A protein has these predicted regions:
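A Zn2+-metalloprotease active-site environment signal
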Residues: 12-278
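Bacterial N-terminal signal peptides
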Residues: 1-10
Length: 278
């Protein structure tokens, strides 16, 4: 069954708990099932439509939640972070219902899965000082979705060709086929990281997303600079992204080249009030 297929992706007990957590936070109870319509994914990945993207995103999201120990259960905080995310997510893909979850993990990182699943760790939230910085981080992850970076990785996967050729019947009768696609995407997302070009594009596009709704353009540079100063340019601090100096340079060039306003709002007081229990 499709549920059995999902359970092979991330382990039964962990997936069930993760599904319940993310379903509660997103307000979408179907996410506990997570893999509805997955047969269509492997039958029509070229091009990937939203229904297929959603199934892929749900499967990846559950793996992220399971690996990072679940999500923070603070409804007011989660609602606030989602409101900031939705303000920033006025992208060229209005079909995407973006939702943000906070991972119960002290590492400093953030992730995005297809179909609008955005994750920030508790550790990263502790490093953020104002709402403009939060908006820039969320803008970066939203850009990964709007630019279809993870879907591009999946489409380029050599393993995918064999799965698509086999089609629907192969996927439903051979869970390992779909699992290999998802596992490859998760490995790229969580362990290896996207290529530097995609990360640079996400920084630039995310900066545009955040500043066009009024957030200060220099806020992101401030955050990246502080993160760099924690351990120099040690990539292990933010292991799935390029080094901070390169990112800071690229963002500054975007600010100058696009004439972005460094006079936008920071909203430090509101951010501090809403995140005091992080």
């Amino acid at each position: 069954t499709l549920i059995a297929l999902l359970l092979t992706v991330a382990g039964c007990a962990e997936v069930q708990r993760a599904g319940e957590d993310i379903a509660r936070q997103s307000g979408n109870p179907r996410l506990a099932g997570a893999i509805h319509g997955v047969g269509n994914v492997v039958g029509s990945l070229f091009p990937i439509g939203y229904e297929e993207e959603s199934s892929i995103g749900q499967a990846i999201a559950l793996q992220v939640v399971a690996r990072y120990g679940g999500v923070v259960d603070q409804p007011e905080l989660v609602r606030y972070v989602n409101l900031v995310g939705r303000a920033v997510a006025n992208t060229d893909r209005p079909d995407i219902p973006y939702r943000v979850a906070i991972l119960e993990d002290e590492s400093i990182n953030a992730f995005a899965a297809p179909a609008g699943y955005i994750f920030v760790t508790r550790g990263l939230l502790k490093q953020i000082r104002n709402e403009a910085e939060l908006a820039a981080v969320l803008g970066h992850e939203i850009a990964h979705v709007s630019q279809k970076h993870i879907l591009d990785v999946i489409q380029r996967s050599k393993r995918l060709a064999g799965v698509t050729e086999a089609g629907l019947s192969y996927a439903t009768s051979n869970p390992a086929a779909f699992k290999s696609v998802i596992d490859g995407a998760v490995k790229k997302l969580l362990d290896e990281g996207l290529d530097q070009g995609k990360e640079t594009e996400a920084d630039m596009v995310g900066e545009l997303f955040a500043t066009r709704v009024g957030y200060d353009a220099d806020a992101y540079v401030g955050l990246l600079t502080r993160l760099r100063d924690l351990k120099g340019d040690d990539r292990a601090l933010f292991k799935t992204h390029p080094n901070f100096s390169a990112r800071i340079d690229a963002v500054q060039k975007t600010i100058q080249g696009k004439h972005l306003a460094a006079t936008g709002v920071l909203l430090q007081e509101r951010f501090s009030r809403m995140t005091k229990r992080v």
